Amino acid sequence: MSLIDWFAARRKDQFVGKVSQDADEGDGLWVKCSECSQVAYRKDLISNFNVCSNCGHHNRINSDERINIIADKNSFEEFDSLLSPTDPLGFKDRRSYADRIKESQAGTGLRDGVVTGICSVNSMPLALAVMDFRFMGGSMGSVVGEKITRIIERATLENFPILIVCASGGARMQEGMLSLMQMAKISGALKKHKEKNLLYMPLLTHPTTGGVTASFAMLGDLILAEPKALIGFAGRRVIEQTLREKLPDNFQTAEYLLEHGFVDVIVKRKDLKTTLAKILKIHGVKELAEANT
């Protein structure tokens, strides 16, 4: 959309929008790409799946946007939406954990950092868990772990494949050992899913780090990733200081992991649904109408 077209569209409102520095920041009508500094009209960016049309940078998107990209229209049925975290340790740093929970819930409209449910992709069933980085950095606490475990168990019971969209800074430190045990719990549920020869795919988005990477994010039959996603366990600076070596510029990117065999395929956001449908079909997943006959 050109400037002339934009002003024509906005003339009745007589409003000049500010430029946001990030696609998920504020409500400015214009957004500056954090990679190439190209300024884009926010509506155009949204219509392009929040991907910069100039350099292809994939901006963060929330769980609702992700579900709309993956699932057939009106097919997503959410489960366990009322599960909400508590503060079992009475944890407090500069602020209490309880206050941080309330703030994140108010800011995102979510109870915790993952949305789970069943949907269809081109009429084929798929169990889906989508982590949302807006909620305390997508950190994995007891509720996140419980919801992911429950959707895996449901997928195992109903013989459905599962996709987990990973976007996380790792285990939630405010819950201590309770958060760390989610790594084993989810991994155990995935083992039972695998024993039934069912398909599990993690989609690694920016960022996927810490305990999430060290557990279910790397246990897939087919590991997908978005372009240039940050994927790793410890931070780059920590590794460099420990090894006393300079790491490659593209270290811990999706492309680096693909080159070294830790990721199977990098999928652009616009191609995600088509790619998932092909994978499901290749693995013999039947359409819901066919499966019920």
From Swiss-Prot:
Zinc finger (C4-type): 33-55
EC class (word): transferase
Note on how the cofactor is bound: Binds 1 zinc ion per subunit.
InterPro entries, per database record: AcCoA_carboxyl_beta, Acetyl_CoA_COase_Trfase_b_su, ClpP/crotonase-like_dom_sf, COA_CT_N, Znf-ACC
Reactions accelerated catalytically: N(6)-carboxybiotinyl-L-lysyl-[protein] + acetyl-CoA = N(6)-biotinyl-L-lysyl-[protein] + malonyl-CoA
GO cellular component, one term: acetyl-CoA carboxylase complex
Primary location class: cytoplasm
Domain CoA carboxyltransferase N-terminal residues, every copy: 29-293
Protein EC: 2.1.3.15
Pathway: Lipid metabolism; malonyl-CoA biosynthesis; malonyl-CoA from acetyl-CoA: step 1/1
Binding residues annotated for Zn(2+), in chain numbering: 33, 36, 52, 55
Cofactor: Zn(2+)
Keywords, ordered alphabetically: ATP-binding, Cytoplasm, Fatty acid biosynthesis, Fatty acid metabolism, Lipid biosynthesis, Lipid metabolism, Metal-binding, Nucleotide-binding, Transferase, Zinc, Zinc-finger
Molecular function via GO: acetyl-CoA carboxylase activity; ATP binding; carboxyl- or carbamoyltransferase activity; zinc ion binding
UniProt record, GO biological process: fatty acid biosynthetic process; malonyl-CoA biosynthetic process
Organism superkingdom: Bacteria
Quaternary organization: Acetyl-CoA carboxylase is a heterohexamer composed of biotin carboxyl carrier protein (AccB), biotin carboxylase (AccC) and two subunits each of ACCase subunit alpha (AccA) and ACCase subunit beta (AccD).
Function as written in the Swiss-Prot or TrEMBL entry: Component of the acetyl coenzyme A carboxylase (ACC) complex. Biotin carboxylase (BC) catalyzes the carboxylation of biotin on its carrier protein (BCCP) and then the CO(2) group is transferred by the transcarboxylase to acetyl-CoA to form malonyl-CoA.
HAMAP family in UniProt: AcetylCoA_CT_beta
NCBIfam families associated with the record: accD
Homology family: Belongs to the AccD/PCCB family.
Full protein name: Acetyl-coenzyme A carboxylase carboxyl transferase subunit beta
Lineage of producing organism: Bacteria, Bacillati, Cyanobacteriota, Cyanophyceae, Synechococcales
Gene: accD
